[in-house]
Amino acid sequence: MSHASLVRRDRDRLLPADPTTRSVARALYERVADAPIISPHGHVPVEWLVEDRPFSDPASLLITHDHYVTRLLHASGVGLDELGVGGSAADPRQVWRRFAERWPLFAGTASGYWISESLQNVLDVTVPLSAATADEAYDRIADQLATPELRPRALFERFGIEVLATTDDPLDDLAGHAALAAEGAVGRVLPTFRPDRYLDPDAAGFAQNVERLVAETGSPGTFAGYLAALSLIHI
């Protein structure tokens, strides 16, 4: 079955609608468009860059591990187990089909925008995503992911990233960051302090996490010790 190709969208689509303002915005953008990327926040696991393995399949890359995507799909009636969330077994192709069937839900969302950008400009998918084109798009992406150009380090270089900040648990040993720095194969990959699981008493496992935090830092099991542990681990 043949399908109409994706329409390449206007290059100014994110700029202001007013013509005068748009021309100024375009001029400003063009001055920095080729500058390297300094990314102060992200969710790229450092292991991706350390191991530099090919991404396994389209679903795990774009759907299963993106909570913005899975939440919207779940709100439309798709079970989280059907999406492979939480370690549940799910066939990647079936996950992709569920996603493609509900692709119109993502119109006007940030997730829809960046997935569209990835499909067109990185993964070279040339058909509009839908239930009818799900398998065609899946196979195209799978073929692309098997190439050296789509491995993590190659993408790091392709995107012009100079600095990438990861999101890290305070008790992470940061061995991956040390290994990358020693190897020097990619730009700077820096850890950032993300103590969320130690700050929300309503979160699952909060008590156990705090106990581990104070134990790892040798702090007393008091509120003052808890604050001291957070301060010590941040340093």
Locations of regions flagged by a protein language model:
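Metal-cofactor-binding active-site regions of metalloenzymes
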Residues: 2-36, 42-232
